[in-house]
Amino acid sequence: MFSRTIPAAARLFSTTGKPPAGIPVIVCGRTSQIGDVVREELQPEYEVTHLFLSPATAKSEIPALLRQTGSTTSTETDKSPAAIIMGGGYTQTDLQEIRAASQGPDTKPVAWLKVDPAKTPSSIPVGPEYGRAVAKRTKDRLDELVRNGGIDRDEVHFI
């Protein structure tokens, strides 16, 4: 039953014969409305464990989540993220600053995905439809990274 709804690459994460939990990811966006749509659209293959709505909060909390030692974040979880996804409302500078703050010898390497608003047709209004379009591009790239092993590399991918 689950082999038809979950891609083969995601099935590799299940060792118990039960449906696999989604691969944990973090989403950074400017609105919860779009963030919630992205979260829903990425399921079941990917589980959004955190949704950050401001670059300042993301910059202070993501580094601890990637270290997974001595975390003091207000949104702590036991699932270490495999990717950080930044929406179109985050700037290139935001990405660079958050990524720089997240570097270190004890930091888990993750894929960084940055939404390029220019890749979304201007005819799509900001709202749920925009969120679905962004989620599709995001999911396609995440699927590709899982297939080719890039999900564990500290690299930036523009989507």
Swiss-Prot record:
Disruption phenotype: Enhances the tolerance to cell wall, oxidative and heat stress but not osmotic stress. Leads to reduced production of kojic acid, together with the reduced expression of kojA, kojR and kojT. Also leads to the increase in mycelium growth and conidial formation. The gene is kap6. This is Kojic acid related protein 6. Negatively regulates mycelium growth and conidial formation and is required for stress tolerance. Plays a role in kojic acid synthesis in coordination with kojA, kojR and kojT where it acts upstream of kojA. It comes from Aspergillus oryzae (strain ATCC 42149 / RIB 40) (Yellow koji mold).
